């Protein structure tokens, strides 16, 4: 715990928001592995998934919020870790409307601020891409701004990944949100020569064009869902995640820095 106190006192960096170029590109994997890596370094990490959709009663134990909390290894209230949970697997605005609810930024920020005060470092995970609407007037970009966190962008390493990544980075920059890194994830196996060529092209061009560190690509793991916790532990020990941990801890000196 001594190291956690040093982080809060000596560094302006207090957290990162794991955003994505799209849904299903590996946000929860990257966030969970990063949480595990930081906690293994003795850093007290708080986690949050402000909004999660597609959580049926039978799937609660496998929800993103629970997986993040398991990676952190603490017992914060799930009502704070994930203030809004909806059944339908659709955008937050639609999922909330289907249940006759409205997502309130104030509710999310109360939970975030409480967790932020308890922990030396916060990792929050978004829902979908950065323009995903969370209510009638706000989107995920507004959420990142409210939390005053740096962004960590997760994207796909295959075909189409270049456009999605550059659009996302541009959107964040237009809102003056600091970006730590772009993490590329192999969402599908690259079995064919063409698929491997496409991935190599995507990664190479993004390293040239992104203007920020590009980490990965993280390899495709077909057994991830069956052995989630074990996979996260393994990923946390890999060179890309260790590099990511160094990047997030070394950054954060911009306008979103918060006192310890």
Task: Annotate each predicted stretch with a short phrase.
Residues 91-134, 141:
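Phosphate-binding/switch loop-helix module in NTP-utilizing enzymes
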Residues 135-158:
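Inter-motif core of Ras-like GTPase G domains
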Residues 49, 152-155, 180-186:
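Short internal beta-strands
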Residues 18-19:
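Hydrophobic anchor at the beta1->P-loop junction of P-loop NTPases
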Residues 15, 29-102, 106, 113-114:
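N-terminal phosphate/diphosphate-binding loop that engages ATP/GTP or pyrophosphate donors
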Residues 2, 170-260:
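C-terminal lobe/tail of nucleotide-utilizing enzymes
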């Amino acid at each position: 715990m001594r190291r956690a106190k040093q982080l809060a006192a000596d560094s302006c960096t207090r957290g990162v928001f794991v955003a994505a170029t799209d849904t299903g590109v590996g946000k929860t994997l990257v966030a969970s592995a990063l949480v595990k890596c930081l906690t293994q370094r003795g850093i007290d990490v708080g986690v949050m998934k402000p909004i999660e959709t597609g959580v049926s009663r039978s799937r609660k134990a496998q929800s993103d919020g629970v997986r993040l909390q398991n990676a952190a290894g603490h017992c914060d209230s799930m009502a704070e870790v994930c203030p809004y949970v909806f059944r339908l697997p659709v955008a937050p605005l639609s999922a909330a409307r289907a249940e006759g609810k409205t997502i309130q930024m104030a509710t999310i920020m109360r939970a975030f601020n409480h967790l932020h005060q308890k922990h030396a470092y916060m990792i929050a995970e978004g829902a979908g891409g950065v323009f995903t609407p969370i209510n009638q007037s706000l989107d995920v970009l507004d959420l990142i701004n409210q939390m005053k966190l740096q962004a960590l962008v997760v994207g796909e390493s295959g075909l189409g990944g270049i456009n999605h990544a550059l659009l996302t980075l541009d959107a964040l920059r237009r809102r003056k949100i600091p970006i730590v890194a772009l993490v590329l994830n192999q969402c599908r196996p690259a079995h064919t020569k063409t698929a491997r060529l496409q991935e190599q092209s995507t990664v190479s061009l993004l390293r040239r064009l992104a203007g920020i560190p590009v980490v990965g690509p993280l390899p495709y793991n077909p057994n991830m869902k069956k052995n989630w916790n074990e996979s996260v532990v393994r990923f946390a020990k890999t060179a890309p995640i260790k590099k990511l941990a160094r990047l997030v801890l070394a950054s954060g000196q911009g306008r979103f820095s918060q006192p310890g």
